[in-house]
């Protein structure tokens, strides 16, 4: 068996790993589906298709068939309420296109798109890891990617697998220094999920780093122009969706006010001030004293992790991406149960975890990851009464 496995091409190994992981996750999710009570999205004990298209999948369905509102829903108190502008168009319209071509229903089509892009993301992740480490570690990084605690999101009606596909492709093109090819990728990526601003920061840091190291690593004018162009494209695309929402609704703040409506249940309606959401969140969860201590400790710990020997072996560029995305989350995101899902774009960190070759260590990581899936599904996906822990 081992001999046959080693003779397989890398892409076949990656696809088999990801398929096996999805099979395990499907069994776990079916167990949860059997025990699922009637809720806002499904009846009791729904089939897999219904169970996997709860929560935000319904919003994507609304986008696909009802489009975006030109008039924002306003509460009696005058606040913007939750609406479709929080969900970007590439994933739902891709699903609708597949439905038109194949005749599939929404549940099936949304899962086909999500799972297909999950397979693609796994293939690109392997290629990305091969830029910085050997075949064995790269393949085990794919294993960790495939069985990660929040990996069930790769086989539900969400846009995350599509987002990770484009992030992996964009990072790979950056490491390959194919900046012109990168431009359309970052533009499309910015309309899958809000990623453009974080990637623009990463590309800006990448350009600065290449400029200061140009003596040992030449940075010719054509590459400079292309890299700066890709950075600008990502920056403009990152602001484009809020601008479009503002133009359609006539309210330039419509997108940010829509996003803020999701955290209002925790802290009420407040203005978005960069880098305050995590302070507000940690104070809400832990109180002002312990919240401040825990937040400072978390930021310091993450900064130190970026300089550990294993993470440094990922190379400067991937660490710049990790830092950029973390800074973006710190600036705009309110920490709650969706945090685990929103950490998914930091998947290059799995490459560092995959470097040690100790068999006990690797088996333990896989077992803990699969157990983590059960925890994530129990805490975040399964609907339990008046559920306040969305995935």
Segments (PLM) and residue ranges:
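Transmembrane-helix motifs of polytopic, lipid-linked glycan transferases
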Residues: 97, 109-132, 303-307
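Short acidic/glycine- and proline-prone juxtamembrane loop motifs at membrane-interface regions
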Residues: 156-162, 339-340
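Membrane-lumen/periplasm interface segments of specific transmembrane helices
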Residues: 21-38, 200-213, 221-305, 318-322
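Short hydrophobic/aromatic helix or loop-helix immediately within or flanking a transmembrane segment
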Residues: 54-73, 77-103, 270-279
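Loop-to-helix entry region of an early transmembrane alpha helix in multi-pass inner-membrane enzymes
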Residues: 79-85, 89, 93, 101-120, ...
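Transmembrane-helix signature of polytopic, membrane-embedded enzymes
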Residues: 105-109, 125-147, 181, 316-320
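Transmembrane and membrane-interface helices of multi-pass
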Residues: 131-133, 139-157, 171-172, 191
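Membrane-interface transmembrane helices that cradle and orient dolichyl/undecaprenyl
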Residues: 170-181, 357
């Amino acid at each position: 068996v081992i001999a046959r496995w080693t003779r397989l091409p890398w892409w076949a190994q990656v696809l088999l790993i990801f398929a096996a992981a999805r099979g395990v996750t499907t069994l776990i999710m079916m167990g949860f589906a059997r025990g699922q009570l009637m809720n806002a999205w499904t009846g009791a004990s729904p089939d897999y298709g219904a169970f996997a298209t709860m929560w935000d999948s319904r919003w994507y369905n609304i986008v696909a068939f009802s489009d975006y509102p030109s008039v924002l829903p306003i509460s009696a108190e005058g606040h913007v309420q939750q609406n479709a502008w929080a969900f970007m168009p590439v994933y739902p319209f891709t699903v609708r296109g597949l439905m038109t071509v194949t005749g599939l229903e929404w549940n099936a089509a949304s899962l086909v798109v999500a799972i297909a892009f999950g397979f693609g993301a796994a293939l690109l992740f392997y290629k990305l890891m091969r830029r910085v480490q050997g075949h064995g570690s790269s393949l085990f990084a794919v294993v960790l990617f495939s069985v990660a605690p929040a990996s069930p999101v790769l086989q539900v009606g969400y846009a995350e697998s599509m987002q990770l596909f484009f992030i992996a492709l964009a990072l790979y093109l950056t490491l390959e220094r194919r900046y012109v090819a990168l431009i359309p990728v970052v533009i499309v990526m910015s309309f899958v999920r809000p990623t453009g601003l974080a990637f623009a920061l990463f590309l800006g840091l990448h350009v600065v780093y290449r400029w200061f190291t140009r003596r040992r690593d030449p940075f010719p004018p054509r590459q400079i122009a292309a890299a700066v162009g890709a950075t600008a494209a990502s920056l403009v695309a990152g602001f484009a969706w809020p601008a479009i929402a503002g133009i359609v609704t006539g309210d330039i703040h419509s997108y940010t006010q829509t996003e803020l409506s999701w955290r209002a249940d925790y802290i009420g309606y407040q203005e978005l001030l960069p880098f305050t959401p995590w302070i507000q969140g940690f104070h809400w969860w832990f109180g002002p004293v312990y919240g401040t201590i825990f937040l400072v400790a978390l930021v310091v710990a993450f900064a130190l992790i970026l300089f550990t020997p294993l993470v440094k072996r990922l190379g400067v560029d991937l660490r710049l991406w990790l830092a950029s995305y973390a800074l973006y989350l710190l600036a705009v995101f309110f920490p709650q149960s969706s945090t685990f899902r929103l950490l998914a774009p930091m998947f290059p960190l799995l490459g560092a975890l995959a470097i040690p070759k100790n068999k006990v260590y690797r088996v333990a990581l896989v077992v803990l990851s699969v157990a983590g899936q059960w925890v994530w599904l129990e805490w975040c996906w399964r609907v339990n009464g008046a559920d306040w822990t969305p995935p």
